[in-house]
Structures are given as structure tokens and as C-alpha cells.
Amino acid sequence: MKSKLKLLSLAAGIALALSGTSVLAAGKYDVGANDKEVKVGNIVPYSGPASAYGNIGKAIAAYFKGVNEQGGINGRQINFISLDDGYSPPKTVEQARKLVEQEKVLFLAATLGTPTNTAIHKYMNKKKVPHIFVNTGAHKWGDYGTYPWTMGLQPDYQTEGKIYAAHILKNNPNAKIAILYQNDDYGKDYVKGMEDGLGDKKGMIVAKASYETTDPTVSNQMATLKGSGADTFFNVTTPKWAAQAIKGAAELGWKPTHYLNSVSSSVGSVMVPAGAENGIGVISSNYFK
């Protein structure tokens, strides 16, 4: 239910941005808009290791279908063009160029992923095409001075990491923490947030292990982290690997206090494949906007 509400809020936010666009009201248009339609671009992983997030693109498309059936926005139909990048940065670049240079969209909205959006960050700003509601919480999306055409969406990952750190310090000040994280800006932002939140207690982190998005499993990393003697586990992953980590901990007989980042707090994409019984006691967070 929470995920559905967030998706609806995201789609409604895009619609609100369109309804408030002055160029539509004035009859003077930028590329991607005219009297009949507005082209909105989107890139999500419908395939590949992060395909669980493909539902985001499908949900937004369904929302705009309903909007169009009710007359559109300011009398214009929304042509929502959503392309698959397989969670591969080079493919994201290819798809962004297609949307901007061939489809000539008014803007990109809700494009998903830290490594994928990073790949098109400079390109979108150079082209001066709005890159809005970036669907990732990386800290870099707040650099409006350098990248004025990019706007983030969700609470940043460093802040979320600090929240978990505060919870650990309050509830288990002698914890031994092990961290599994994705080896890119996405994962590293969470690790930094945890370290900053622990402050002079960051020595509580006794082990870290990273994985690449091309890795088939994280079984070796989980065995290493268990072997560290940690009693607290910070699981900084995307759904595929989050499910593996939860299930892997159970198979190893490792029962730490388990913190799971909000990105992977999904029942259908994570808890079901991990085994619901293995997810009992997992601590996570969520947000509404």
C-alpha cells in the first residue's frame, strides 16, 4: 500500500508540474509541447537486475492513461514515453539521447537509479532539458548551482543512513555493525550517512562488503560479514540482492539486528522471494511526499 501511494504521488506530482507550466497556458511552447500534446520522457529498468522497478514506469503510464481519458491536462494529452535501460548506464545514455534528440520530449521525469542518472546528469544539463523527480536519493541531486536542470525526488540516502545510525546508538550502543552495499554512489552515500551518524562511534562498523550490479549473488559477501562477528547488519541493496541477503542470512544461521534501506522495503519484490519467515524482525523506513 505504501509503495502504491508513493507511485500515485509521483505521477500526480508530474501532472501538477505540467498543469502549472506557464508555456502551456500562454500558447507559446518549448520543444515537446503543442496545442494537442505534451511529451514526457522516462527511463526505468524493465529488464535486467533491477527489473522489479519496472512497475514504476507501468504505474505512471497507467496514471497518465487515466488522465488522458478524462481530457488530459489543460486540454492536452500526455504522451508518456517510457524506455528500458536494463539498469545499464551506457543504455541509459542511449535512451536519453533518443528521448531528447529524436522524440524531442519536454522533459525527463522519474528516471530511476543512481548509476543510471549519473550517466546522463551532465548531458541533460548541457542540453538544458529538465531532468526532474530523479528517482534516486543520491546526495548529488541537491547541487542546484552546478546542475540547475536536475531536481531530485526523495529524501537523500545520507540522511537515511544517519537515521539508522541514531536508532542503533539509542537501542544498542555497543553494536558491532556489518554493512553490505552496492559499489557505486548509491551504496556509498548510505555508508557515509551511517558513518557520519555514528560520529566518533564509527568504529562500531566491524566489516563492509560491496557487490557489483553484475554479480549474480552476494553469498560470498554474506559469509564474510557473518564471520566478522557482527550482531547488527545494514543491508544497502536493491531488491534482487536484498532478497538474497535476507535469505542468505537465514541459511547461514546468522541472526543480527537487520536494517534494510527504504529502496528495498518491498513485500512483493523482496520479502516474498526472500521467504516471509526470513524477513521477520527486519527494520526499515519509508517516506511520503
What spans do the regions from the language model cover?
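Glycine- and acidic-residue-enriched helix-capping/strand-helix junction motifs
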Residues: 49-59, 185-189
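Active-site-proximal beta-strand/loop segments in catalytic clefts of secreted hydrolases
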Residues: 43-46, 83-86, 110-113, 134-137, ...
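Extracellular/periplasmic Venus flytrap/periplasmic-binding protein
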Residues: 91-94, 139-142, 148-253
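Short beta-strand segments enriched in small/hydrophobic residues
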Residues: 36-55, 176-180
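Short helix-capping segments at alpha-helix termini
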Residues: 67-74, 127-129, 198-204, 250-256, ...
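Extracellular/periplasmic periplasmic-binding protein-like sensory domains
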Residues: 249-289
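Short, low-complexity disordered leader/linker segments with a strong preference
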Residues: 1-39, 69
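Beta-alpha junction/loop-to-helix N-cap segments that form part of ligand/metal-binding clefts
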Residues: 26-28, 37, 52-58, 70-143, ...
